[in-house]
Amino acid sequence: MLTFIELLIGVVVIVGVARYIIKGYSATGVLFVGGLLLLIISAIMGHKVLPSSQASTGYSATDIVEYVKILLMSRGGDLGMMIMMLCGFAAYMTHIGANDMVVKLASKPLQYINSPYLLMIAAYFVACLMSLAVSSATGLGVLLMATLFPVMVNVGISRGAAAAICASPAAIILAPTSGDVVLAAQASEMSLIDFAFKTTLPISIAAIIGMAIAHFFWQRYLDKKEHISHEMLDVSEITTTAPAFYAILPFTPIIGVLIFDGKWGPQLHIITILVICMLIASILEFIRSFNTQKVFSGLEVAYRGMADAFANVVMLLVAAGVFAQGLSTIGFIQSLISIATSFGSASIILMLVLVILTMLAAVTTGSGNAPFYAFVEMIPKLAHSSGINPAYLTIPMLQASNLGRTLSPVSGVVVAVAGMAKISPFEVVKRTSVPVLVGLVIVIVATELMVPGTAAAVTGK
């Protein structure tokens, strides 16, 4: 009975939050209210409000406010600062004319590509490769928004389509050393090499190709439906005085991430890399003009871009975090787990149930890690009691948690991309919905075809 009540409360609040965001209310305000309401109800029901890693203040009422403080410090300090730095960097690149120079140079070969959607797909594949270097979905999203997004928009790709490309690369896991993959390999009782490269990677590649094709047709359909015209920017309209080599500057963060990954050079944080990139750009500006006042005034543009990012993106991330914690403390995730364990032992049925519940949990909470970490703990027990190959259950769940995050209007990556693109999170979700669902279907079918369903098939008995 309690499980039903917790699910009902979660669903009612989720529907209410979605309704008011769709009606045009501030997403930050609506998510804050929804999250605080869930935390208050959790406290009344006797649930612990703060995560287990945090010490209570002694009172549930102050614990609620304490959690908001924790999020402000964590998301405003690390992730938030990274987002603000990326937004400030993007603003500075526009100010000094580097983005204009990229478009000016790129427009020449792009004249031979009749469809901007082909360029969009090429950008998607590049973005997917970037996920190997940047493991954070939100971090990858904001990095792509600061680098690829302006280029895509300026060469004729709609803002919605370009935002979808930046939001969706982390939906399918490629990185073999990410925490999710390591945990999934353990739950599957396989070595990391066998699990990541021999089993998961072929499925991931198939899903990425399918999602790329889906992006091509779905973004084109939505653009036609919404009467969005695609006109290549007239190069003659670009009046930038920046030298041609400035075209490399917007991509220096990506180059820095690849170089300073601990293999080719020292391992540096993305914020450190961005500081280096800003210093390089400002020094080049000084060499061009020998005008210190002009350089300092230009940097003020970057600072204002950082301030706008705090108001439009970081605070939205904090509100989304409060909402996700409210769903967690109310028992919403645990209730979904209880439902999963009540189903029978048929491998395909159990796999589909786990995929759907993991996807639902990821969509509602906005987290890819939390639902997977919660569900994956019961995989070995479920698999052994049912005679099912653990990997058969783990791989679709692993991908479903990340795919579901891309469909969540409260997930960090969707919120950050929407905020930087200045469009609604629901617009991003709409743009990613069909490609994500296509990817999910491919993952399920590929798992059924490529991964043995029974433990006996794996052991050869």
From Swiss-Prot:
Query: Where is this chain primarily localised?
Result: membrane
Report the catalytic activity.
Answer: fumarate(in) + succinate(out) = fumarate(out) + succinate(in)
What does the UniProt entry say about where the protein is found?
A: Cell inner membrane
- Which UniProt keywords are listed? Antiport, Cell inner membrane, Cell membrane, Membrane, Transmembrane, Transmembrane helix, Transport
* Topological type in the membrane: Multi-pass membrane protein
Q: Where are the transmembrane segments?
A: 2-22, 26-46, 79-99, 116-136, 137-157, 164-184, 199-219, 240-260, 267-287, 313-333, 343-363, 436-456
Q: Which GO terms describe its molecular function?
A: antiporter activity; C4-dicarboxylate transmembrane transporter activity
Origin: domain of life = Bacteria
For the keyword Signal, the answer is no
Which GO cellular component terms are attached?
Answer: plasma membrane
Which Pfam family is one of this chain's hits?
A: DcuC
Role, per record: Responsible for the transport of C4-dicarboxylates during anaerobic growth. Catalyzes the uptake of fumarate coupled to the export of succinate.
NCBIfam families (alphabetical): DcuC (TIGR00771), DcuC_1 (NF037994), PRK10654.1 (NF007937)
What's the family?
Answer: Belongs to the DcuC/DcuD transporter (TC 2.A.61) family.
Q: What is this protein called?
A: Anaerobic C4-dicarboxylate transporter DcuC
* Organism listed in the record: Escherichia coli O6:H1 (strain CFT073 / ATCC 700928 / UPEC)
Q: Identify the taxonomic lineage of the organism of origin.
A: Bacteria, Pseudomonadati, Pseudomonadota, Gammaproteobacteria, Enterobacterales
What's the name of its gene?
A: dcuC
